[in-house]
C-alpha cells in the first residue's frame, strides 16, 4: 500500500 514496513496492514506487509 505504502512505502515502508507495515505501511498499511500486516496482511499487506511490504506490498
Swiss-Prot record:
GO terms for cellular component: extracellular region. Expressed by the venom duct. Keywords: Amidation, Ion channel impairing toxin, Potassium channel impairing toxin, Secreted, Toxin, Voltage-gated potassium channel impairing toxin. The keyword Secreted applies. The keyword rRNA processing does not apply. It is found in: Secreted. This is Conorfamide-Sr3. It comes from Conus spurius. It comes from the Eukaryota. Belongs to the FARP (FMRFamide related peptide) family. GO terms for molecular function: potassium channel regulator activity; toxin activity. This peptide has moderate activity on some voltage-gated potassium channels. It reversibly inhibits the Shaker voltage-gated potassium channels (Kv) from drosophila (Kd=2.7 uM). In addition, it also irreversibly inhibits human Kv1.3/KCNA3 (IC(50)=24 uM) and Kv1.6/KCNA6 (IC(50)=2.7 uM) potassium channels. Negative results: does not affect potassium channels from drosophila (Shab, Shaw, and Shal), as well as the human channel Kv10.1/KCNH1/EAG1. Does not show activity on human Kv1.4/KCNA4 and Kv1.5/KCNA5. The mature peptide does not contain cysteine residue. The modification Phenylalanine amide is found at residue 15.
